[in-house]
Swiss-Prot record:
Its EC number is 2.3.1.74. Pfam families: Chal_sti_synt_C, Chal_sti_synt_N. This is Chalcone synthase 6. GO terms for molecular function: acyltransferase activity, transferring groups other than amino-acyl groups; naringenin-chalcone synthase activity. One of its GO terms (biological process) is flavonoid biosynthetic process. It catalyses: (E)-4-coumaroyl-CoA + 3 malonyl-CoA + 3 H(+) = 2',4,4',6'-tetrahydroxychalcone + 3 CO2 + 4 CoA. It comes from Glycine max. InterPro entries: Chalcone/stilbene_synt_C (IPR012328), Chalcone/stilbene_synt_N (IPR001099), Chalcone/stilbene_synthase_AS (IPR018088), Polyketide_synthase_type-III (IPR011141), Thiolase-like (IPR016039). The active site is at C164.
Length: 388
């Protein structure tokens, strides 16, 4: 006969949650940012809006994005003219695409992560699936379970419509699951496809145009678990997490699922709101570790846009190289919502190993991962790198 206390103790892992593998995937269709404005205005039958086109060109030039990947290619858009309009009922057409494509792209990223992890997929105990693209029942988590051939008893968590902070949310949840369920191995998948947000231009709603200049498609997957076996190779420890709603930020970023798809609204002062509150989040996270020099840690910040990164850098006096991995992902992929920070995590460990920097975190021990999104919500994750 065992006591409840003994049962509870046996359920808990001994060590911290670790990221054991990372995989990423994008659709094959790649768009060049320099030629995108001409293509976008042509495909949406908006070539007559010359002034707006010039404005959009300036947005794309300032975006610091070189290229993006998109499931929506010219052929698909020509078959779905309602998706190209600014505000035409088109949710059915959009849903038909994402319900299939979101799990499919997620599978590609997950397969790569599982391969790197090197363990049989039957050892996956939990699945967290996150997407801002579309909603369905049973969800993308169920579809992915079937596509990958995971055990039917895998414990699934489906997160829909969280937005750009959710790359932090999934790591926070995965940490709690791994540390409170001994032997747990959590597959985390973020898969984002812009088919729900793509629409033609409007000169009365410029914030919608900002999204058209920034958003791209991508999926990322990680395996999270505590107490790694000798065959498992941890990449980062997940040490501490937090989520907070910024003061006076209501309505700064919001999205609404309508007949016309997912509409986005952004206020101009989003970079200001984030940079004004970033120090407080860092103090809360790093004071217990005795760290107050934020150039001494490695950085993974959701690249909502270049202005956010610029203002955070300026506010904290960060050296330009601190945001190198973050800016690289923005430049090569655009803003992929929840998947972005996991792409940056992947880029950071790869470059750190390539450059022989001694740890997975650019040679440094401690690091921070930030998610920023609707609310305005900020997710903070304290990371500890691994010696390589």
């Amino acid at each position: 006969m065992v006591s409840v206390e003994e049962i509870r103790k046996a359920q808990r892992a001994e060590g911290p949650a670790t990221v054991m593998a990372i995989g990423t995937a994008t659709p094959p269709n790649c768009v060049d940012q320099s030629t995108y404005p001409d293509y976008y205005f042509r495909i949406t039958n908006s070539d007559h809006m010359n002034e707006l086109k010039e404005k959009f060109k300036r947005m794309c030039d300032k975006s610091m994005i070189k290229k993006r990947y998109m499931y929506l290619n010219e052929e698909i858009l020509k078959e779905n003219p309602s998706v190209c309009a600014y505000m035409e009922p088109s949710l059915d057409a959009r849903q038909d695409m994402v319900v299939v494509e979101v799990p499919k792209l997620g599978k590609e990223a997950a397969t790569k992560a599982i391969k790197e992890w090197g363990q049989p997929k039957s050892k996956i105990t939990h699945l967290i699936f996150c997407t801002t693209s579309g909603v369905d029942m049973p969800g993308a988590d169920y579809q992915l379970t079937k596509l990958l051939g995971l055990r039917p008893s895998v414990k699934r968590y489906m997160m829909y419509q969280q937005g750009c902070f959710a790359g932090g949310t999934v790591l926070r949840l995965a940490k709690d699951l791994a540390e409170n369920n001994t032997g747990a191995r959590v597959l985390v998948v973020c898969s984002e496809i812009t088919a729900v947000t793509f629409r033609g231009p409007s000169d009365t709603h410029l914030d919608s145009l900002v999204g058209q200049a920034l958003f791209g498609d991508g999926a990322a997957a990680v395996i999270v678990g505590s107490d790694p076996l000798p065959a498992e190779k941890p990449l980062f420890e997940l040490v501490w997490t937090a989520q907070t709603i910024l003061p006076d930020s209501e309505g700064a970023i919001d999205g609404h699922l309508r007949e016309v798809g997912l509409t986005f609204h952004l206020l101009k002062d989003v970079p200001g709101l984030i940079s004004k509150n970033i120090q407080k989040a860092l103090v809360e996270a790093f004071q217990p570790l005795g760290i107050d020099d934020y150039n001494s840690i490695f950085w993974i910040a959701h690249p909502g846009g270049p202005a956010i990164l610029d203002q955070v850098e300026a506010k904290l006096g960060l050296k330009p190289e601190k945001m190198e991995a973050t800016r690289h992902v923005l430049s090569e992929y655009g803003n992929m919502s929840s998947a972005c920070v996991l792409f940056i995590l992947d880029q950071m460990r790869k470059k750190s190993i390539e450059n022989g920097l001694g740890t997975t975190g650019e040679g440094l021990e401690w690091g921070v991962l930030f998610g920023f999104g609707p609310g305005l919500t900020v997710e903070t994750v304290v990371l500890r790198s691994v010696t390589v």
